[in-house]
A protein has these predicted regions:
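Boundary/linker segments of alpha-helical solenoid repeat arrays
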Residues: 134-136, 163-177
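TPR/TPR-like (Sel1-like) alpha-helical repeat modules
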Residues: 151-167
């Protein structure tokens, strides 16, 4: 008999389940940032603090804290970690792990056997080793841990994801005047999905600003969200001049 780690399965709702889980994650992250006024990212200041060995936000220290699942990391620490990543040698805004598609295919092949849950965990972890801020792989990794009843580990990884969401949302309001700042295109869609919207169109407005149109929601007037990708494009132009 095959042991299933996901006993309730409706093939028509597999994507809706994921969206519901992500909505819960957003709620947690919004609570985390509720008392924090959004403010613009000062990349010059970020560079100064993360490159100073005597600063509490020295990048190697931040990365060690992050990788050790340190739940004492503040939102300010996460802001310097996330935006400071753009100054690291291995930063590639368009990076995609070779394992990411493997994980996605396994995830949507429901219900899962125990071995398949193990594989989702394994390949999601390998994907995150390649692309540390891949929120989709974080979701899959957390899913596999919960399915295997590793709730403590799942909670630690959930904290990471919640803080990253809060970090992006603390950078603005998603408006033309105060866009959210992201360091990879994927994160634009992650935020849109976390808010419970479905993207319908993507526009490049110039000056490093992008606009994602969303499907209308009943009772909501939101038509879309603005994102600042200027730092991402600045680095891409230097590292990939032929693009």
């Amino acid at each position: 008999m095959i042991e299933h780690c996901n006993k309730k399965y409706d093939p028509m709702n597999k994507r809706l389940i994921l969206i519901a889980v992500m909505a819960l994650m957003l709620g947690l992250s919004c609570l985390a940032q509720a008392k924090i006024k959004p403010r613009k990212v000062d990349f010059k200041h970020v560079k100064e603090v993360i490159e100073n060995p005597d600063n509490i936000y020295y990048y190697p220290k931040l990365m060690r804290q992050f990788q050790s699942d340190d739940t004492t990391m503040t939102l300010e620490a996460y802001r310097n970690l996330y935006y400071g990543y753009t100054f690291q040698e291995d930063y590639n805004p368009f990076r995609e792990s070779v394992y990411s598609n493997v994980v996605e295919q396994l995830y949507y092949k429901q219900p899962h056997s125990r071995a398949e849950c193990d594989s989702i965990e394994k390949y999601a972890r390998m994907s995150l080793d390649d692309n540390i801020f891949d929120m989709n792989q974080m979701k899959f990794f957390i899913f596999s841990l919960k399915e295997k009843k590793k709730y403590n580990r799942a909670a630690l990884r959930q904290f990471r994801l919640d803080r990253l969401i809060a970090t992006i949302m603390s950078s603005g309001k998603g408006t033309k005047e105060e866009p959210w700042v992201v360091i990879t295109p994927e994160h634009e869609y992650n935020i849109v999905n976390f808010l419970g919207y479905r993207a319908t169109n993507h526009e490049e407005l110039g000056d490093g600003i992008e606009y994602i149109t969303v499907e209308p929601k009943e009772g909501k007037s939101t038509k879309g969200f603005y994102f600042d990708v200027s730092r991402m494009m600045e680095v891409a132009a230097l590292k990939f001049p032929d693009m």
